Structure formats: C-alpha cells, structure tokens
C-alpha cells in the first residue's frame, strides 16, 4: 500500500503531524498544530498537496486516544478523507522494537505512519 499518509500523534492541547508520500518517503517532517480551525485547515492544505503530488487521495492515520482523537477523526471524515484509527497497543509494539527508547510526539507521528505501512489496517467507519 503506497498511498500518501498524514500521520498524527494526538495530544491534549496540540498534536504533531507528519506527511509521507509513500513508505519511507517523507514529505513533511513532524510539526505541531493546535486543535483550532486554523490548525486543522493547515492539515487539509497538506493533504491537498499530497494528492496533487501523488495523484492519490491520502489517508489520515492516528492512534485512538478517546476524547482527544474523536473530534479530529470527525473533522477529516466530514472533509471526505479516509481515517485509519490505530489501536495504541499496535504502536506500542513498534516503540518496543526501536533500539533507542524515545518518547516524543514528533517521533510518535513517524511511528504511527510506520505501523500503518507495515500492517495496512482498514479505514474506520464514519
């Protein structure tokens, strides 16, 4: 599955997003964004750029974090993007495989994309 991906590490007040053209091919390094209309619109702009470059509609991938991830999932589904919600246990397994144990939101955004490309999970139902 070589589709473009916007991976998001969701946190309480702000989250981090990284964009990939395909597995291992980064388009945008992990950057923070606020949970505001302006912050979300900047991510939609990134998704539009990904689609223009690749000719494929990107998917949004994030970890299930309950109250924090639900509004983000709804936002992207309303914008007609497929959203893949990963089980946190899946991404935790990826962290355990890493040689260096690093817990930072930017690195987590990359790991979320890695789990997506390795496991090919199906998009969540709207």
Regions found by a protein language model. Give the residues of each.
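Phosphate- and other anionic-substrate recognition elements at nucleic-acid/protein interfaces
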Residues: 1-126
């Amino acid at each position: 599955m070589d589709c473009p991906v916007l991976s998001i590490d969701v946190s309480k007040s702000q989250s981090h997003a990284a964009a990939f053209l395909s597995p291992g091919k980064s388009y945008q390094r992990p950057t923070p964004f606020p949970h505001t209309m302006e912050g979300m619109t900047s991510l939609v702009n990134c998704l539009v750029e990904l689609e223009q470059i690749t000719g494929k509609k990107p998917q949004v991938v994030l970890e299930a974090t309950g109250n924090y991830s639900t509004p983000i999932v709804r936002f992207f589904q309303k914008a007609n993007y497929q959203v893949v919600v990963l089980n946190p246990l899946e991404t935790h397994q990826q962290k355990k495989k890493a040689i260096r144990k690093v817990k930072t939101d930017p690195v987590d955004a990359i790991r979320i994309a890695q789990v997506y490309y390795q496991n090919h999970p199906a998009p969540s139902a709207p």
